[in-house]
Amino acid sequence: MGKRYQNHDDLEEINVEIEVQGLASISKNIKESVVGLTLPQVRYLVDAYYQMQGARMAMENQARSLIQGYDSTVDGAKDAHPLAIQWTSKAFRNDEGQIQKMLDKYTDSIPMGRYLKSIKGIGPVLAAGLLAYLNIDKANHANQFISYAGLNDNNNPWLGRDGSAKLIKELKTMFPDENPKNLSDDVFIEICRRTHRSFESVRLYSQVREEKTNERKGYTTWDSLQSYLAMPPYNKDLKTLCYKIGESFKMVSGRESSLYGKLYRQRKAYETIKNDNLEYADQAAAILKKKNIGKGTDAYKAYSKGKLPKAHIQARAQRATVKIFLHHVFDAMYFEKYHIDPPTPYVLEYMGHEDMIYPEVDYKEFF
């Protein structure tokens, strides 16, 4: 049996080992190097952080199953893990921390990064992710940010393999005289009408690609169009990041000084009332019909009563809050680039009336 964690001295031993063998601290040169990172490089670090975090959490869950009742927070806990296993966990956490420090340095070097980190619930990793994925040069209004983040699924749903195949079959019937090796703009226009995608995006991203170079060839076939339509019409990584932002706003919802935490609470209460009044009964019935939900689950009990489960209501509240936040992020990026206010102030039809919702922090102080 390996040596077990007994006292503070043993914990110090683990920390010393990490100092010697792990990435206990990164040098000043490494920290400074992040200032000039490209956006793809920032995305790499953000992805690396979350991949490392996911691996560490899976590893810790597996370690907990080795001994029952393990609690690493209790000094002198009985039946604790051997030092070797504790060292591994702390080394993983340490590596996460080093990436976080680098992203903190990176976001400190950018006014928009400093603005984002001034918002409660947004730390250096989330801020860096937003900077890496959102490009004001490619957006004319906030809804484009929201769509790119996959938060407008009702307007532009992910068709998937089956949905795209069905749509292509319908289009072939509608346009029987089309050249199958070079589709016309008429097909693209119909795609835009049905999916709410932009004409430029459909025509560009549906083109056949060169196998070796992956370069676009300038024409679209039925097969290349179907492949394009089968892909998510949003950035999956950004959507995941926005989910994490929503979770973070939920965690700070107890702070009165947190605007987005407060909006989350209000929206959750609003959604709960609508749910209790069975205003989502049609959605509940549709989900129950479409998905194979275990009859013994709380979700099934809710759907069968014409209601959405609590987790679903919570997710709706988080998405609504993140949408408001993304509007504010767009406004801030627009002001930073053009030094004027966005053309149309964001007015939200919210809680049954229209309110102007101002950002938690005045972004003009940072630019």
Which residues does each predicted region cover?
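Short, Lys/Arg-enriched phosphate-binding patches
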Residues: 116-121, 133-134
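Long, charge-rich intrinsically disordered scaffolds of nucleic-acid metabolism proteins
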Residues: 2-108
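Long, contiguous secondary-structure blocks with strong helical propensity
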Residues: 71, 75, 105-114, 164-170, ...
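Catalytic Zn2+-binding segment of zinc metalloproteases
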Residues: 134-141, 152-153
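Cytochrome P450 catalytic-core helices
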Residues: 129-130
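A basic, often C-terminal nucleic-acid-binding module that engages the phosphate backbone, implemented
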Residues: 156-367
